[in-house]
Structure formats: structure tokens, C-alpha cells
Amino acid sequence: MPLPAIDPAEYASQLADKVTQFKHAFTPFAVPEPTVFPSAPLHYRLRAEFRMWHDGERIDYAMFDPAEPKQPIAIEQFDIAAEPICAAMPRLRERLRASETLKRRLFQVEFLATLSGELMISLIYHRPLDESWEAAARELAAELNVQLIGRSRKQKIVLDRDWVLERFALDGRPLQYKQIEGSFTQPNGGVNRQMLGWACEQVRGVGGDLLELYCGNGNFTVALAPLFDRVLATEVSKTSVEAAHYNLAANDIGNVAMVRMSSDEISAALARTREFRRMKDVDLDRYRFSTLFVDPPRSGLDAPTVELARGFDRILYISCNPQTLQENVAALQATHGIAGAAVFDQFPYTRHLECGLLLTRRGGPRAP
């Protein structure tokens, strides 16, 4: 994680610059005025990781400037981190400094917090962990009231559980999400909640069935599923699929079929060019897809997935990379136009911008 330059007084102007760049980039596609969802200027980041810098008996959190990658910068406080992380950082450092067992060859510390106040800390070592470490770690976890995990090469010690439970309300509806250590979770919880709300508004009243690619732990699936008759969701990560199944059950979602497949594979399955054992319990003939939802990696949609998308009347696209989003929109321009747009400032004080587009078929929906 790079060291950001943080000045809350500059936040609004920095966001305005990013929005201007977004609008300029998508002007050739007649993008409507985007809805802008800002971040809180401080305490917005639910994930943080630090190298641990040892100097004699002293140990400190450290980050590195890309311009001087070998020179550590000691971190006394980290105001962009969520408040549970900020509160735990000095207490954890004190306990590490006081315990040779806990600090010896400690290489890195990772924090994962939730909007609902839970916190998980992973301590990563360059040595095997033994019973004495586990005893000291249990005392530390109890004192800090956190989930604590120890890692070293080919070793993982989970003292209680390796996940936290996120809880928040969306349009008055209480939601909960299991977030597993080491798997992808949204870094900016406040902005994520705004993304979910915007996505729901784009498809409210549409009905029909939804195909979702890259569903992760079900972040959007849980929010969107009640707005559709049926949902077919795909994801390749085993841990994310496990979390998604938990999250669907925990939120009483019963209209989602989930399969562990890549976008290439589901494209082939829908085109009936390949059969997959993983699809044996899914009757594709029952689905009447009205909408495709995608939240792909930075590389965007590959050519087969773009071809798949052309067959949908509505494409709801969340992107963490406006450049590949531009490329995909250009590839779809002959069949789809932009009907709605939003920008989500997941990463304040950086050049990165999350964005969302609603693409609809030119000339209206196809006849059923």
C-alpha cells in the first residue's frame, strides 16, 4: 500500500479534478452527468497493512515512498484508516515492544475492520510459530478484543476465527457479510454502501433474471437479488464462493444459484458450446435474463465476455479502471449506449477512481 499525501482541505478539489477527467474521457460516448459519491476525508479505509521496522528493542509500523523504496517511513498514526484500526495501532505496538515472543522476526501487520466495529489483525512472521507464541497471542487478542491470526511460511494459526462480520443497513434493510482474511473486500466501506445503493436504483422495477459475473463474496449479489426473480452468479475464488454462500444464507436470499466459474466458462455455457459438471444443477433454459451485472478486475472484460454482454438489454458495470471501461464501452458502442453514470471515490488522495455505468440496448429491449 503506497503512502498517500493526506490533506482534508484539498479533498474536494482533488475529487473535482478526478470527476472532470472522467467526464472528459467518456465525452465521446455521450455520457450523462455522473452522480458523484464522495468519501469521508478521514477514517474511511477498512484495510491497512504495514511493514514492521525493527531497531534494537524498538519496533514500529513502517511504509515506503515509491521514490525511495529502501527508506522506511515510521508511521505514528494513520488517519485514513478506520477508527477501530487507529485505536488499535498504538496499543498493539506497545504490546509488541514489550514481548520478545510476539515481536521476534515479525515482518508485517495487516488490519481488516468493519463499519460495525469488528477488527481482525494478522501478524506475519519470518519464523515458525510455536506454542509460546500462541499463548502470548491469545493474551494479546483478549486484551485488544480482536480476531488474531498468525502467519509464517506454510503456517497459519487462527486463534478463534479468520473472518469478521460486516453489518449495515441499505435502504432500511439490514445486511451482513462474512469477510474472510486474505480474500478481497471493499476497502472503503462508506463508499461501498453508496455503490450498492446506486446499483439498486439502476435496476429497480426492471424485474426478470440477473446474471452476475465476478461476484466475489456476494457484496452486490445480496443487495441486488431481491430486485430480480432469479440470479445466476459466478466467481472463481474458492474462499470468496464460500463467503458468498454464507452471506446469501445469512441474509435470507433464496433466489441465487452460484457456480464457481470464470467469465470465459459461463460465456461458453450460455452459448451451449461447452458443458460443465459444475452446471449440472443449473437449468439455463429457465432463465430469462434482463440484466448483466459485472464488477471485473482492473483488466476489464475480455473479448468473449464483451460478446456475451452484447446479448443483454441492460449492462450494469462497476469498474475500478476507467481506461479498460472505456475500451469495453467502445466495443459495445454499436449496440449499447450509456443511460446512467456515477463515480465513487473509493481511494481519496490518489489518482484511482471507481465508476459505474448503466448501458442499455439501442432501440430498446429485444422482443421476448
From Swiss-Prot:
GO biological process: tRNA methylation
Alphabetical UniProt keywords: Methyltransferase, S-adenosyl-L-methionine, Transferase, tRNA processing
Matches recorded under Pfam families: tRNA_U5-meth_tr (PF05958)
Listed GO CC annotations: cytosol
MF GO annotations: rRNA binding; tRNA (uracil(54)-C5)-methyltransferase activity, S-adenosyl methionine-dependent; tRNA binding
Recorded catalytic activity of this chain's protein: uridine(54) in tRNA + S-adenosyl-L-methionine = 5-methyluridine(54) in tRNA + S-adenosyl-L-homocysteine + H(+); uridine(341) in tmRNA + S-adenosyl-L-methionine = 5-methyluridine(341) in tmRNA + S-adenosyl-L-homocysteine + H(+)
PROSITE patterns membership: SAM_MT_RNA_M5U, TRMA_1, TRMA_2
Record-linked InterPro entries: MeTrfase_TrmA_AS, MeTrfase_TrmA_CS, SAM-dependent_MTases_sf, TrmA_MeTrfase, U5_MeTrfase_fam
Active-site residues (renumbered): 320 (nucleophile), 354 (proton acceptor)
Residues given in the record as S-adenosyl-L-methionine binding sites: 186, 214, 219, 235, 295
UniProt EC number: 2.1.1.-, 2.1.1.35
Protein purpose: Dual-specificity methyltransferase that catalyzes the formation of 5-methyluridine at position 54 (m5U54) in all tRNAs, and that of position 341 (m5U341) in tmRNA (transfer-mRNA).
UniProt xrefs under NCBIfam families: trmA_only (TIGR02143)
Family listed: Belongs to the class I-like SAM-binding methyltransferase superfamily. RNA M5U methyltransferase family. TrmA subfamily.
The protein, known as: tRNA/tmRNA (uracil-C(5))-methyltransferase
Biological source species: Aromatoleum aromaticum (strain DSM 19018 / LMG 30748 / EbN1)
Gene that this sequence comes from: trmA
